């Protein structure tokens, strides 16, 4: 991952790098890899995430349609 530093503004470059890493899911991946996750736990977590995503999409769809 690469970020340009303009006018020696390192703080702005760090902020941009952190934003890019957040979008890419690097922090989330690091958090998940800190400890071993059993395959059954992984399946359960992914299923729960899918349910959460589906509910969120349904809420947004209903909000868009005006219900």
Swiss-Prot record:
InterPro entries: Ribosomal_bS21, Ribosomal_bS21_CS, Ribosomal_bS21_sf. Coiled coil: none annotated. GO terms for molecular function: structural constituent of ribosome. Keywords: Ribonucleoprotein, Ribosomal protein. Transmembrane segments: none annotated. PANTHER family: MITOCHONDRIAL 28S RIBOSOMAL PROTEIN S21, SMALL RIBOSOMAL SUBUNIT PROTEIN BS21M. NCBIfam families: S21p (TIGR00030). Belongs to the bacterial ribosomal protein bS21 family. This is Small ribosomal subunit protein bS21. It comes from Gluconobacter oxydans (strain 621H) (Gluconobacter suboxydans). The gene is rpsU.
């Amino acid at each position: 991952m690469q970020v340009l530093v303009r006018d020696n503004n390192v703080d702005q470059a760090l902020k941009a790098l952190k934003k890019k890493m957040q979008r890419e899911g690097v922090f989330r991946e690091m958090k998940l890899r800190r400890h071993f996750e059993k395959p059954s736990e992984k399946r359960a977590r992914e299923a729960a995430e899918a349910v959460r995503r589906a509910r969120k999409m349904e809420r947004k769809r209903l909000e868009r349609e005006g219900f």
